[in-house]
């Protein structure tokens, strides 16, 4: 396979008329059909509540998968799945065709022929960061809080992490913004040091 994305090694998949359950990857993804035909069903991340995802662990391939069989859904058991499919994008690819799957978009892949070849190019736009680790820390530190405290932290995350109201440090002079300022290697190193220090203290308890 050619080096379609600079610095990204392609991965080659050879198989039969198989199906890949609905899942998402924490990467950007370009999939190229080398042989056979494949049907891709893409669903935006906002549909997570309608997809009836399985556990985070254990998983068949390291990522969550939906409990719904897309080609034969049980709508009585999974009634919200119809709403997810209303937002779906579906593409059928022949050999030589390619599809871009955006970061964290859910997708189902169905190989339509008895012999199929697929080439994947996965890359992480921010390779030094791990939102998954942040989420795991949230499971430990936030999920068991009382509802009023979770609401308070949700407001904090919306403002300071997800920037729901714009730049939360815009009213401060640049030299006083601290972790609210521009993300630089030095700032990232400082925040990581704070995280490591906090984890070390908790592990000693």
What residues fall within each predicted segment?
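Internal glycine-rich, Lys/Arg-flanked active-site/core loops of soluble domains
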Residues: 1-18
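Double-stranded beta-helix
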Residues: 5, 17, 33-100, 105, ...
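A short beta-loop-beta micro-motif enriched in histidine and acidic residues
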Residues: 7, 19-29
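Conserved, well-structured core segments
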Residues: 12, 29-32
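A generic "binding-loop/recognition-motif" signal
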Residues: 18, 26, 105, 115
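Short glycine/proline-enriched turns and hinge-like loops at secondary-structure junctions
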Residues: 23-26, 33, 43, 111-113
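Conserved double-stranded beta-helix
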Residues: 90-93, 134-205
């Amino acid at each position: 396979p050619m080096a379609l994305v600079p610095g990204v090694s392609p991965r080659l998949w050879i198989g039969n008329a198989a199906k890949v359950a609905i899942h998402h990857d924490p990467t950007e993804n370009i999939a190229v059909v080398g042989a056979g035909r494949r049907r891709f069903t893409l669903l935006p991340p906002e549909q997570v509540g309608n997809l009836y995802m399985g556990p985070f662990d254990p998983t068949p391939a390291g990522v969550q998968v939906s409990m719904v069989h897309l080609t034969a859904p049980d709508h009585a058991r999974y009634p919200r799945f119809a709403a997810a499919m209303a937002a779906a994008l579906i593409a059928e690819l022949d050999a030589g065709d390619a599809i871009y799957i955006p970061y964290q978009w859910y997708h189902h892949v169905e190989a339509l022929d008895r012999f199929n070849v697929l080439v994947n190019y996965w890359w992480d736009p921010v390779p030094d960061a791990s939102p998954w680790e942040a989420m795991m820390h949230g499971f430990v530190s936030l999920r068991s809080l009382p509802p009023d405290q979770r609401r308070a932290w949700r407001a904090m995350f919306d403002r300071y992490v997800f920037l729901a109201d714009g730049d939360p440090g815009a009213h401060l002079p640049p030299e006083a913004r601290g972790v609210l300022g521009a993300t630089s290697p030095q700032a990232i190193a400082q925040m990581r040091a704070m995280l490591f220090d906090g984890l070390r203290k908790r592990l000693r308890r």
